[in-house]
Amino acid sequence: MQGQPTRKQLAALVDHTLLKSEATHADVAALVAEAVELGVYAVCVSPSMVPAAVEAGAGGLRVATVVGFPSGEHVSIVKAQEAVQAVASGATEIDMVIAVGAALAGDLDAVRSDIEMVRSAIAGVVLKVIVESAVLLGQANERTLAEVCHVAEAAGADFVKTSTGFHPAGGASVRAVTLMTEAVGGRLGVKASGGIRTAVDAIALLDAGATRLGLSSTREVLDGLS
Protein backbone atom coordinates (compact mmCIF):
# COMPACT_ATOMS: atom_id res chain seq x y z
CA MET A 1 0.00 0.00 0.00
CA GLN A 2 1.40 3.37 -1.02
CA GLY A 3 0.30 6.65 0.53
CA GLN A 4 -1.73 7.25 3.65
CA PRO A 5 -4.68 4.92 4.18
CA THR A 6 -7.96 6.03 5.68
CA ARG A 7 -8.76 5.02 9.24
CA LYS A 8 -11.11 2.33 7.94
CA GLN A 9 -8.56 0.99 5.47
CA LEU A 10 -5.84 0.74 8.10
CA ALA A 11 -8.11 -0.87 10.68
CA ALA A 12 -9.07 -3.54 8.15
CA LEU A 13 -5.42 -4.66 8.03
CA VAL A 14 -4.97 -5.02 11.79
CA ASP A 15 -4.78 -8.04 14.06
CA HIS A 16 -5.69 -6.34 17.37
CA THR A 17 -3.36 -8.15 19.74
CA LEU A 18 -3.17 -9.09 23.41
CA LEU A 19 -0.53 -11.70 24.24
CA LYS A 20 0.60 -10.65 27.71
CA SER A 21 0.74 -13.59 30.09
CA GLU A 22 -1.16 -11.66 32.75
CA ALA A 23 -4.18 -10.99 30.50
CA THR A 24 -7.50 -12.00 32.07
CA HIS A 25 -10.80 -13.03 30.52
CA ALA A 26 -12.05 -9.52 31.25
CA ASP A 27 -9.09 -8.09 29.35
CA VAL A 28 -9.89 -10.31 26.37
CA ALA A 29 -13.54 -9.28 26.44
CA ALA A 30 -12.43 -5.63 26.42
CA LEU A 31 -10.06 -6.35 23.53
CA VAL A 32 -12.87 -7.90 21.50
CA ALA A 33 -15.24 -5.02 22.23
CA GLU A 34 -12.59 -2.55 21.12
CA ALA A 35 -11.87 -4.62 18.01
CA VAL A 36 -15.52 -4.49 17.00
CA GLU A 37 -15.65 -0.75 17.65
CA LEU A 38 -12.50 -0.06 15.62
CA GLY A 39 -13.39 -2.36 12.73
CA VAL A 40 -10.17 -4.38 12.74
CA TYR A 41 -9.56 -7.54 10.72
CA ALA A 42 -9.09 -9.90 13.68
CA VAL A 43 -8.00 -10.23 17.27
CA CYS A 44 -4.91 -12.20 18.26
CA VAL A 45 -4.82 -13.77 21.72
CA SER A 46 -2.97 -16.50 23.59
CA PRO A 47 -4.16 -20.08 22.96
CA SER A 48 -5.82 -20.41 26.36
CA MET A 49 -7.85 -17.28 25.63
CA VAL A 50 -9.25 -18.38 22.27
CA PRO A 51 -12.54 -19.66 23.75
CA ALA A 52 -13.01 -16.41 25.67
CA ALA A 53 -12.36 -14.35 22.53
CA VAL A 54 -14.74 -16.46 20.47
CA GLU A 55 -17.43 -16.17 23.14
CA ALA A 56 -16.96 -12.42 23.51
CA GLY A 57 -17.19 -11.99 19.75
CA ALA A 58 -20.31 -14.15 19.56
CA GLY A 59 -18.68 -16.10 16.76
CA GLY A 60 -18.70 -13.10 14.44
CA LEU A 61 -15.07 -12.03 14.82
CA ARG A 62 -11.94 -13.61 13.38
CA VAL A 63 -9.71 -14.95 16.14
CA ALA A 64 -6.01 -15.61 15.61
CA THR A 65 -3.69 -17.24 18.10
CA VAL A 66 -0.05 -18.18 18.48
CA VAL A 67 1.73 -21.54 18.45
CA GLY A 68 5.20 -22.35 19.78
CA PHE A 69 5.18 -18.90 21.30
CA PRO A 70 7.36 -17.03 21.92
CA SER A 71 10.59 -19.05 21.59
CA GLY A 72 9.71 -21.39 18.73
CA GLU A 73 11.73 -24.13 20.41
CA HIS A 74 8.79 -26.43 21.08
CA VAL A 75 8.84 -29.92 19.55
CA SER A 76 7.03 -29.83 16.20
CA ILE A 77 4.32 -32.26 17.23
CA VAL A 78 3.55 -30.07 20.23
CA LYS A 79 3.16 -27.05 17.94
CA ALA A 80 0.87 -29.09 15.69
CA GLN A 81 -1.30 -30.26 18.59
CA GLU A 82 -1.44 -26.74 19.97
CA ALA A 83 -2.67 -25.54 16.58
CA VAL A 84 -5.27 -28.31 16.32
CA GLN A 85 -6.62 -27.50 19.78
CA ALA A 86 -6.75 -23.78 18.97
CA VAL A 87 -8.72 -24.38 15.79
CA ALA A 88 -11.08 -26.72 17.65
CA SER A 89 -11.63 -23.89 20.14
CA GLY A 90 -12.57 -21.48 17.36
CA ALA A 91 -9.32 -19.93 16.12
CA THR A 92 -9.47 -19.03 12.43
CA GLU A 93 -5.79 -18.13 11.97
CA ILE A 94 -2.59 -19.54 13.46
CA ASP A 95 0.65 -17.58 13.93
CA MET A 96 3.46 -20.10 14.57
CA VAL A 97 7.04 -19.36 15.59
CA ILE A 98 9.76 -21.12 13.60
CA ALA A 99 12.64 -23.04 15.12
CA VAL A 100 14.82 -19.94 15.21
CA GLY A 101 17.92 -21.79 16.36
CA ALA A 102 17.67 -24.19 13.44
CA ALA A 103 17.39 -21.26 11.04
CA LEU A 104 20.49 -19.61 12.50
CA ALA A 105 22.36 -22.92 12.21
CA GLY A 106 21.42 -23.15 8.53
CA ASP A 107 19.26 -26.25 9.07
CA LEU A 108 16.50 -25.20 6.70
CA ASP A 109 15.22 -28.77 6.41
CA ALA A 110 14.37 -28.68 10.11
CA VAL A 111 12.67 -25.32 9.71
CA ARG A 112 10.62 -26.63 6.80
CA SER A 113 9.57 -29.89 8.47
CA ASP A 114 8.50 -27.95 11.56
CA ILE A 115 6.24 -25.70 9.50
CA GLU A 116 4.95 -28.60 7.42
CA MET A 117 3.84 -30.51 10.51
CA VAL A 118 1.70 -27.59 11.64
CA ARG A 119 0.45 -26.95 8.11
CA SER A 120 -0.69 -30.54 7.64
CA ALA A 121 -2.44 -30.51 11.01
CA ILE A 122 -4.62 -27.51 10.15
CA ALA A 123 -5.18 -27.74 6.42
CA GLY A 124 -7.32 -24.89 5.15
CA VAL A 125 -6.65 -22.62 8.13
CA VAL A 126 -4.64 -19.43 7.57
CA LEU A 127 -1.07 -20.05 8.75
CA LYS A 128 1.34 -17.21 9.47
CA VAL A 129 4.99 -18.08 10.09
CA ILE A 130 6.87 -15.87 12.56
CA VAL A 131 10.52 -15.70 11.52
CA GLU A 132 11.92 -13.32 14.18
CA SER A 133 13.42 -11.13 11.48
CA ALA A 134 15.41 -8.96 13.91
CA VAL A 135 17.20 -12.06 15.18
CA LEU A 136 17.94 -13.39 11.70
CA LEU A 137 19.22 -10.02 10.50
CA GLY A 138 21.18 -9.40 13.67
CA GLN A 139 22.81 -12.81 14.07
CA ALA A 140 22.84 -13.99 10.45
CA ASN A 141 22.19 -11.94 7.31
CA GLU A 142 19.68 -10.88 4.68
CA ARG A 143 20.15 -14.10 2.75
CA THR A 144 19.12 -16.17 5.76
CA LEU A 145 15.93 -14.13 6.17
CA ALA A 146 15.09 -14.57 2.49
CA GLU A 147 15.82 -18.31 2.63
CA VAL A 148 13.57 -18.78 5.64
CA CYS A 149 10.77 -16.94 3.81
CA HIS A 150 11.26 -19.24 0.81
CA VAL A 151 11.09 -22.27 3.11
CA ALA A 152 7.88 -20.98 4.69
CA GLU A 153 6.36 -20.60 1.24
CA ALA A 154 7.44 -24.10 0.20
CA ALA A 155 5.98 -25.53 3.40
CA GLY A 156 2.55 -24.05 2.65
CA ALA A 157 2.39 -20.92 4.77
CA ASP A 158 -0.07 -18.17 3.89
CA PHE A 159 1.94 -15.35 5.50
CA VAL A 160 5.41 -14.65 6.76
CA LYS A 161 5.47 -12.53 9.91
CA THR A 162 8.32 -10.46 11.26
CA SER A 163 8.28 -10.94 14.99
CA THR A 164 6.75 -12.20 18.20
CA GLY A 165 7.24 -8.79 19.75
CA PHE A 166 8.76 -10.50 22.78
CA HIS A 167 12.38 -10.95 21.68
CA PRO A 168 14.94 -8.41 22.91
CA ALA A 169 16.40 -8.19 19.40
CA GLY A 170 13.39 -6.12 18.42
CA GLY A 171 10.24 -6.17 16.34
CA ALA A 172 9.23 -5.13 12.86
CA SER A 173 11.45 -2.92 10.71
CA VAL A 174 11.10 -1.40 7.27
CA ARG A 175 14.27 -3.22 6.23
CA ALA A 176 12.89 -6.61 7.26
CA VAL A 177 9.49 -6.07 5.68
CA THR A 178 11.10 -4.92 2.43
CA LEU A 179 13.31 -8.02 2.30
CA MET A 180 10.45 -10.35 3.18
CA THR A 181 8.18 -8.77 0.58
CA GLU A 182 10.86 -9.21 -2.06
CA ALA A 183 11.37 -12.83 -1.02
CA VAL A 184 7.73 -13.89 -1.30
CA GLY A 185 6.93 -11.70 -4.30
CA GLY A 186 3.26 -11.20 -3.52
CA ARG A 187 2.60 -14.94 -3.31
CA LEU A 188 2.26 -14.78 0.48
CA GLY A 189 1.08 -12.07 2.78
CA VAL A 190 3.57 -10.23 4.98
CA LYS A 191 2.58 -9.42 8.56
CA ALA A 192 4.55 -6.80 10.45
CA SER A 193 4.36 -6.98 14.22
CA GLY A 194 6.31 -5.88 17.25
CA GLY A 195 6.95 -2.31 18.34
CA ILE A 196 4.48 -0.61 15.99
CA ARG A 197 3.14 2.19 18.14
CA THR A 198 2.42 5.13 15.83
CA ALA A 199 0.64 5.82 12.56
CA VAL A 200 3.99 6.82 11.07
CA ASP A 201 5.40 3.38 11.94
CA ALA A 202 2.38 1.62 10.47
CA ILE A 203 2.35 3.57 7.22
CA ALA A 204 6.08 3.05 6.69
CA LEU A 205 5.66 -0.71 7.07
CA LEU A 206 2.66 -0.80 4.74
CA ASP A 207 4.63 1.20 2.17
CA ALA A 208 7.43 -1.38 2.51
CA GLY A 209 5.01 -4.16 1.59
CA ALA A 210 3.23 -5.32 4.75
CA THR A 211 -0.28 -6.61 4.10
CA ARG A 212 -1.22 -7.17 7.75
CA LEU A 213 -0.21 -5.45 10.98
CA GLY A 214 -0.10 -6.91 14.47
CA LEU A 215 -0.87 -4.07 16.88
CA SER A 216 -1.47 -3.86 20.60
CA SER A 217 -1.75 -0.05 20.41
CA THR A 218 -4.38 -0.07 17.69
CA ARG A 219 -6.44 2.88 18.89
CA GLU A 220 -3.35 5.05 19.31
CA VAL A 221 -2.14 4.18 15.82
CA LEU A 222 -5.52 4.89 14.24
CA ASP A 223 -5.91 8.13 16.19
CA GLY A 224 -2.52 9.21 14.82
CA LEU A 225 -3.75 9.34 11.25
CA SER A 226 -3.97 12.96 10.14
Curated annotation (Swiss-Prot):
Its main location: cytoplasm. It is an enzyme of class 4 (lyase). The keyword Cytoplasm applies. It comes from the Bacteria. One of its GO terms (cellular component) is cytoplasm. Transmembrane segments: none annotated. It is found in: Cytoplasm. Keywords: Cytoplasm, Lyase, Schiff base. Its EC number is 4.1.2.4. Pfam families: DeoC. It catalyses: 2-deoxy-D-ribose 5-phosphate = D-glyceraldehyde 3-phosphate + acetaldehyde. InterPro entries: Aldolase_TIM (IPR013785), DeoC (IPR011343), DeoC/FbaB/LacD_aldolase (IPR002915), DeoC_typeI (IPR028581). HAMAP family: DeoC_type1. PANTHER family: DEOXYRIBOSE-PHOSPHATE ALDOLASE (PTHR10889:SF1). Belongs to the DeoC/FbaB aldolase family. DeoC type 1 subfamily. This is Deoxyribose-phosphate aldolase. It comes from Mycobacterium leprae (strain TN).
